[in-house]
């Protein structure tokens, strides 16, 4: 089951990237789908092309930057709106909220950011740092349990 990620950035790449994550004796395919910008569902950027790729995924990962001018909550709402405007079925998919770049924020800000999502009873909320590796293993463990069990 492919997993989809989407960054909430105004700067976007030109094509999706596929990768395989090996986990224990199993593996799964991930698809990094860039280009989901505001207005993507109306054809802005490369949005429609990329949104079609998302339709084929099993689990969505919303990668939201902790160290950004746009709050993680607003990033999430914008991405969710674009998905819903393209297809309501996308909003029915299981998803993860992954707050990235947590190495760039203090503990109090991290706590408040994650609590915002937890207060809304989202089950799959993780924070990671690609630089330090913090939280990455826990995220992979959880995704793998969902896929392989």
Q: What does each model-identified segment do?
A:
Residues 1-12:
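Single conserved hydrophobic/aromatic residue that forms the stacking wall/gate
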Residues 10-27:
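AAA+/P-loop NTPase substrate/partner-engagement loops
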Residues 16, 43, 58:
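Phosphate-binding active sites in nucleotide-utilizing proteins
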Residues 18-20, 35-37, 66-70, 101-105, ...:
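Conserved nucleotide-binding/hydrolysis micro-motifs of P-loop NTPases
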Residues 32, 50, 79, 139:
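Conserved RecA-like P-loop NTPase ATPase core
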Residues 105-149:
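Canonical P-loop GTPase G-domain recognition
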């Amino acid at each position: 089951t492919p997993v989809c990620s989407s960054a909430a950035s105004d700067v976007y790449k030109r094509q999706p990237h596929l990768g395989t994550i090996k986990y224990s004796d199993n593996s799964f395919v991930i698809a990094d789908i860039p280009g989901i910008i505001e207005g993507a569902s109306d054809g802005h950027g490369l949005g429609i092309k990329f949104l079609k790729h998302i339709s084929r995924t099993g689990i969505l990962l919303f990668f939201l930057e902790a160290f950004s001018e746009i709050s993680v909550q607003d990033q999430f709402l914008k991405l969710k709106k674009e998905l819903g405007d393209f297809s309501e079925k996308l909003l029915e998919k299981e998803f993860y909220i992954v707050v990235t770049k947590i190495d760039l924020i203090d503990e109090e800000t991290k706590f408040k950011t994650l609590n915002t999502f937890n207060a809304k009873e989202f089950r799959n909320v993780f924070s990671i740092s690609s630089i330090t590796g913090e939280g990455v293993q826990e995220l992979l463990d959880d995704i793998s349990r969902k896929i392989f069990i």
